[in-house]
């Protein structure tokens, strides 16, 4: 139980808060001023609520320093931190209000890479990545049901070992690509049936999860980013119906509307385009509805 704080001490602490707030009074950008003063108020409120010790302050500074050291062109520890604290999903929720039947957005994640290879409709994004084949198909429409042709559909995912291509030490490009929707808004491609995997947990964010008894596991998912002129950019996933991690995804990214049925197909079942597959495979339909910009 914390020791009561005297009125005199509270006044000294509040005086400091007011002085820091006034230091931003001359900020020319009104939005920057609003953000910095709000950040100051909430940060000091947190410090005073928990009565942070100097040792804990040093630990926090060390944590942020470690997050900076581990961040590079292949790994973004600060995005992971934002994700596991729910800040990413909260920001997405605030900036992507529901618009009719538009597909819901979810977290971007730290593993998107610009310049993915293009495939034609019916192509394969796997690029040699290990995993059970999965046929993905659907349409891209607007909220009035009209097809959206030539929408750019970026897709990426982890392989069967739970790693994205950028987590390997070589320069491979695998399990990521982009394609365009057809004149009728249709699209289709081969991918890998998603499986659960842990977010990188060998750094400071992983240590925080371990210290708080939280799992680093993500529910099975496939990433999408869909762009088209005059439409709101959509960043989303589809999740696998029946996955036991749906209710405890480590980054709070699951939304009911994004949980889809991945229908298992036995070995020897006819495949779209006549592709030869030795073992079982799956198929899923994901119809995408884009909100206006």
UniProtKB/Swiss-Prot annotation:
Keyword Iron: yes
GO BP: any one term: beta-ketoadipate pathway
One Pfam family hit: Dioxygenase_C
Needed cofactors: Fe(3+)
Leader sequence segment: none
Annotated pathway: Aromatic compound metabolism; beta-ketoadipate pathway; 3-oxoadipate from 3,4-dihydroxybenzoate: step 2/4
Temperature dependence: Optimum temperature is 50-55 degrees Celsius.
Keywords: Aromatic hydrocarbons catabolism, Dioxygenase, Iron, Metal-binding, Oxidoreductase
Record EC number: 1.13.11.37
A GO MF term: 4-hydroxycatechol 1,2-dioxygenase activity
Positions annotated to bind Fe cation: 164, 197, 221, 223
Regulation acting on activity, per entry: Inhibited by 3,5-dichlorocatechol, chlorohydroquinone and 4,5-dibromocatechol.
Cofactor note: Binds 1 Fe(3+) ion per subunit.
Subunit structure: Homodimer.
Family indicated by similarity: Belongs to the intradiol ring-cleavage dioxygenase family.
Protein name per Swiss-Prot or TrEMBL: Hydroxyquinol 1,2-dioxygenase
Species the sequence originates in: Nocardioides simplex
Gene transcribed to yield this protein: chqB
């Amino acid at each position: 139980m914390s020791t009561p704080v005297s009125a005199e001490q509270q006044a000294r602490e509040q005086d400091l808060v007011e002085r820091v707030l006034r230091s931003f009074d001359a900020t020319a950008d009104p939005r920057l001023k609003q953000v910095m003063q709000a950040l100051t108020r909430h940060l000091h409120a947190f410090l005073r609520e928990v009565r942070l010790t100097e040792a804990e302050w040093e630990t926090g500074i060390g944590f942020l320093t470690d997050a900076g050291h581990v961040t590079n062109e292949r790994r973004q520890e600060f995005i992971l931190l934002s994700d596991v604290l729910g800040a990413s999903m909260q920001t997405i929720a605030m900036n992507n209000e529901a618009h009719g039947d538009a597909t819901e957005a979810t977290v971007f994640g730290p593993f998107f890479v610009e310049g993915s290879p293009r495939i034609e409709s019916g192509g394969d994004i796997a690029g040699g990545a290990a995993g059970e084949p999965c046929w993905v198909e659907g349409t891209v429409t607007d909220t009035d049901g009209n097809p959206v042709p030539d929408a750019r559909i970026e897709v990426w995912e982890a392989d069967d070992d739970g790693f994205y291509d950028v987590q390997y030490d070589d320069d491979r490009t695998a399990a990521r690509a982009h394609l365009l929707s057809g004149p009728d808004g249709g699209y289709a491609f081969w991918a890998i049936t998603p499986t659960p995997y842990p977010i990188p947990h060998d750094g400071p964010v992983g240590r925080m999860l371990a210290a708080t008894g939280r799992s680093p596991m993500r529910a099975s998912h496939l990433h999408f980013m869909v762009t088209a002129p005059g439409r709101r950019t959509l960043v989303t996933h589809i999740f696998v119906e029946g996955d036991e991690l749906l209710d405890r995804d480590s980054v709070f990214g699951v939304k009911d509307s994004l949980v889809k049925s991945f229908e298992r197909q036995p070995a020897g079942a006819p495949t779209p385009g006549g592709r030869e597959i030795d073992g079982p495979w799956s198929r899923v339909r994901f119809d995408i509805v884009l909100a206006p910009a």
